């Protein structure tokens, strides 16, 4: 019997028997019938097929596929205590454990694959280049590096591609948590500070971090927490966002140092980051290439922050209780507490 003569319910099962995403795409493009049938494929099946093509087509692995799919598991877990515990357990095994968690509970659509693949060239790679100029080889190649060439010289072992995806993953994971603080009247659920900190603790390898249950980082040269802490505290990071805010949101926006910065400015920067890939388009894409949808969303975020009467509450961490972390997503201070081992 010819393939296309099979009943529709049988054709719908075909994607589950394919070996990878290339076979899926080739079959879907072979004729209109299969294209229409494959359009109904479950997101979990598409993610499994994409995983079978990694790392050849989705690198760096596993960060790229985690960035593409982690919002789906965040949505699945948010507001459910038992599911949030499973998510935190996944964090504690590192990024590969989080990847496995995404495969088990998450999913991808073809549109999301296309969107993320395009974002690699328009957003992720340009962001990686900017981070390399803040903390990587380009930064350390600045003339007179140790003698005034940069304002914050340091010795860092930085993988800029990995760092870009790590902060994008954070935004994709906790974007809806920020929405809860932008819309306080709606009483939306959010992940708490501890859950957010555990992402940094376990999913960013660092040889000086105590949060390494299997000892895998003991003799490594990973410094991912230290690197991201440096980036998020740096003046270049603030200036990058300030330039985008002036371009798209407020031509009169000014950039002060962290001590003098109004809480709304920091919250705006964090809230744009918490849009994930969409938010980073503001700083990574050329101004004329930023989608209008991303600009409109950013303006809505700005307006909601301006409408807030007071900043979100904070909690203090550390032995002396001197490290404040906002109850709203606060990546700079969360990774700072994680790196400084102030839990003990």
Where are these regions (language model features)?
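Short helix-loop-helix/strand-helix junction enriched in hydrophobic and basic residues
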Residues: 7-14, 22-43
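Charged/polar low-complexity intrinsically disordered regions
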Residues: 42-257, 261-262
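Charge-dense, extended regions
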Residues: 192-344
């Amino acid at each position: 019997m010819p393939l296309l003569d099979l009943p529709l319910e049988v054709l719908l099962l075909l994607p589950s028997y394919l070996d990878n995403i290339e076979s899926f795409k080739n079959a879907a493009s072979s004729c209109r019938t299969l294209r229409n049938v494959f359009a109904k494929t479950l997101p979990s099946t598409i993610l499994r097929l994409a995983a079978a093509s990694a790392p050849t087509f989705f690198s760096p692995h596993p960060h790229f596929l985690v960035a593409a799919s982690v919002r789906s598991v965040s949505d699945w877990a948010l507001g459910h205590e038992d599911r949030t515990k499973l998510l935190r357990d996944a964090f504690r095994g590192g990024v590969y454990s989080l990847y496995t968690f995404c495969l088990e509970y998450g999913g991808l659509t073809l549109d999301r694959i296309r969107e993320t693949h395009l974002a690699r060239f328009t957003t992720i790679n340009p962001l990686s280049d900017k981070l390399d100029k803040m903390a990587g080889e380009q930064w350390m190649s600045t003339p007179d590096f140790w003698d005034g060439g940069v304002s914050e010289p340091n010795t860092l072992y930085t993988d800029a591609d990995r760092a870009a995806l790590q902060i994008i993953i954070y935004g994709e994971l906790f974007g809806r948590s920020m929405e809860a603080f932008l819309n306080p009247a709606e009483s939306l659920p959010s992940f708490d500070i501890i859950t957010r900190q555990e992402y940094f603790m376990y999913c960013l390898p660092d040889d000086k971090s105590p949060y390494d249950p299997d000892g895998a980082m003991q003799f490594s040269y990973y410094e991912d927490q230290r690197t991201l802490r440096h980036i998020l505290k740096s003046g270049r990071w603030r200036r990058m966002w300030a330039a985008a805010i002036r371009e798209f949101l407020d031509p009169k926006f000014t950039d002060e140092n962290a001590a003098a910065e109004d809480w709304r400015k920091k919250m705006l920067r964090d809230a744009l980051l918490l849009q994930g890939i969409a938010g980073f388009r503001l700083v990574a894409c050329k101004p004329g290439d930023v989608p209008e949808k991303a600009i409109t969303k950013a303006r809505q975020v700005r307006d909601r922050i301006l409408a807030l009467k007071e900043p979100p509450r904070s909690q203090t961490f550390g032995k002396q209780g001197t490290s404040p972390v906002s109850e709203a997503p606060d990546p700079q201070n969360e990774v700072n507490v994680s790196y400084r081992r102030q839990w003990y």
